[in-house]
Amino acid sequence: MSLATLDSMGGASTGSVTVTEQLNFWAGRRVGGRNSEHAEPVFEPATGRVLCQMVPCGAEEVDEAIMSAHAAYVQWSKKSGTERARVMLEAARIIRERREKIAKLEVINNGKSITEALVDIDVAWQCIEYYAGVAGTLAGQHFQLPGGAFAYTRREPLGVCVGIGAWNYPFQIAACKSAPALACGNAMVFKPSPFTPVTAVILAEIYKEAGVPDGLFCVVQGGAETGSLLCNHPKVAKVSFTGSVPTGKKVMEMSAKGVKQVTLELGGKSPLIIFKDCDLENAVKGALMANFLTQGQVCCNGTRVFVHKDILPQFLEEVVKRTKAIAVGDPLLDSTRMGALITKPHLEKVLGFVRQAKKEGGRVLCGGEPFVPSDPKLKGGYFMSPCILDNCRDDMTCVKEEIFGPVMSVLPFDTEEEVIRRANNTTFGLASGVFTRDISRAHRVAASLEAGTCFINNYNISPVEVPFGGYKMSGFGRENGQVTIEYYSQLKTVVVETGDVENYF
């Protein structure tokens, strides 16, 4: 969908859009897939109808994209940080100007509510704007050495970076991976999820309109095979991947063969701990934020909700009431708070977790069933009612495994020491949360939790200035914040002698 077509999105509605434009982008233009016999249908989650066809890129196309990116990198890396910042600020401005139309297209491809999608697009331009500000500040250090000698360091780009995105935040992930890469002087080849191929190419066109060299941000479509070609290409210097743990392991293994730098943002089964001295109203709202954004399809969601036994009845009463009131339906309506899950197989997988929880002794307090909206055009959509599971134990499947859907597992606890031990009893470590009025306890628990992020008296708030990433099997490296510059650049040390060389021999 070209930028010109994007401008016609103002009047688009659910079920009314079909994408026929080419979805790859390199050398400054859209490129069609050459392996049309391998085309895969992409479905609109809210209706179940075919939105477009995704044609995966093969070895020849991947090579063309990477060589295009490398040529652009040679030009871009020679620009000053201020010059790069100027172009990036223009890209942020264009996104901001077209946020509503981009958000609509994101909803049609992804299924989340328009209210959430607008926030996602805002985060995208804010991230590009933030790293534009960082670009002009990149600098090394000076070291005075004995005898008038000195040394200095140069912070240099890596080269061609690969970004592999997930389907829950398609446009935002493309922006948040490319922004620090471009700020440091790199180029990026980005592969979206095959379920959400539509909006990353819009970002590529926006970068081109803003003035980046042709090829600086390329988009290649495809699944696992295309991803493998990217990770194994000798011209690629770094891979940044967002997705599941099993796929992340494969990305790491493939990248290791070429000694490429890797950032992995993987899955989670994050704990949210609610102490009895909390503000219960805020704790309930936090639990909803921790479980039901993007239909529960968020890697850092706090899906293990530990509630002190003394307030468990009050918490359950209020959280069930609020959950039943969540408006599920047409994601393009402003009143909708939960849209459709990404695919029919994924919907069935999530519903299967609920069935398994019941077999293992869990009690469904609300939801956990297929939901059919009243609008006839949504009959084939992938909707379900948000679910609260009570009577959960730490050894249950729904508590141990990442569900990636709108399912909250509630677990009672008694003491602080007990709940910290139970919260850390997982192979994941992406996020965590604490609700308490006791400031000492809040910081004590935050220090004890084995997770890359800990939210205190809130949840799922991730400003672009703040680093985000995991512990343990949730990955390594960071996205967002100043520290991410270190993951998209390398240091060169230059040692200068101003006198004579010592005659050792």
UniProtKB/Swiss-Prot annotation:
It comes from Oryzias latipes. GO terms for molecular function: 4-trimethylammoniobutyraldehyde dehydrogenase activity; aminobutyraldehyde dehydrogenase (NAD+) activity. Keywords: Cytoplasm, NAD, Oxidoreductase. The keyword Disulfide bond does not apply. The keyword tRNA processing does not apply. Coiled coil: none annotated. This is 4-trimethylaminobutyraldehyde dehydrogenase. Pathway: Amine and polyamine biosynthesis; carnitine biosynthesis.
